Amino acid sequence: MFTGSIVAIVTPMDEKGNVCRASLKKLIDYHVASGTSAIVSVGTTGESATLNHDEHADVVMMTLELANGRIPVIAGTGANATAEAISLTQRFNDSGIVGCLTVTPYYNRPSQEGLYQHFKAIAEHTDLPQILYNVPSRTGCDLLPETVGRLAKVKNIIGIKEATGNLTRVNQIKELVSDDFVLLSGDDVSALDFMQLGGHGVISVTANVAARDMAQMCKLAAEGHFAEARVINQRLMPLHNKLFVEPNPIPVKWACKELGLVATDTLRLPMTPITDSGRETVRAALKHAGLL
């Protein structure tokens, strides 16, 4: 469940900015049918930053309910205060989710020792498997391989989503962790190369709109068929890139609407609707991928 193509799913909203249950069900059904390995609910792409804690928990639980055992659900539970991250994580104890994706604290930029103590404290307050999430381009904080190696010794810290796009990190981390420590790319552009170096899969934005292709690419990679996987990846490469032509999740939410997967591309401020030029750029990438 922690390998292959795991989607960082969008949180669909109605025109008033409320979570749209019908669109969420449609998305989940799409991922079940497409072979997606698991869903990350309310991560960065799921607009965690603009949901309050009650809404955050409600969306995760709604996702779990609508999935109904058909696909594993991972909860995004990161926060920049350790006590807050613990509180959010504990909401999902005994809920049925299979694990938590926990981003490094953002804005306050802790030291490596602070990061170690932060993640260790969270893990000690739950039995849920914990996946570390390193995305310094968003957080201003880089979880270094040496710290990952220390954290990998904590019993329920089972993997990392490594979103630096720096492929040297794969081997650096592999040298410091056990073979069963899960290495997931958080960068669609370099995900296939990441897997060829020994990674186990990707937590993907592209999978929101190209779920079957991403699942097949990851399956081929896991089987060692990298030439075939690369054919799929090259077709998706413009999409990997152009889904970030404006801040995530603006482009991917619009793409979901364009493909009829959600009813609206509504976002909450300070996120704003996609621009006309962004729309045309993403539409061209969708066509290149064979999705339009």
Curated annotation (Swiss-Prot):
GO: which molecular function terms? Answer: 4-hydroxy-tetrahydrodipicolinate synthase activity
Read off the InterPro entries from this record: Aldolase_TIM, DapA, DapA-like, Schiff_base-form_aldolases_AS, Schiff_base-form_aldolases_CS
KW Amino-acid biosynthesis (keyword) present: yes
Which portions of this protein are annotated as coiled-coil regions?
none
Does Zinc appear among the keywords? no
What disulfide bonds does the UniProt entry report for this chain? none
In this chain, pyruvate is annotated as bound at T45, I203
- PROSITE patterns linked: DHDPS_1, DHDPS_2
Localization, UniProt: Cytoplasm
How it assembles, according to the record, is: Homotetramer; dimer of dimers.
**General function of this protein:** Catalyzes the condensation of (S)-aspartate-beta-semialdehyde [(S)-ASA] and pyruvate to 4-hydroxy-tetrahydrodipicolinate (HTPA).
- Its recorded name reads 4-hydroxy-tetrahydrodipicolinate synthase
| Species of origin | Shigella dysenteriae serotype 1 (strain Sd197)
- Gene name, Swiss-Prot/TrEMBL: dapA
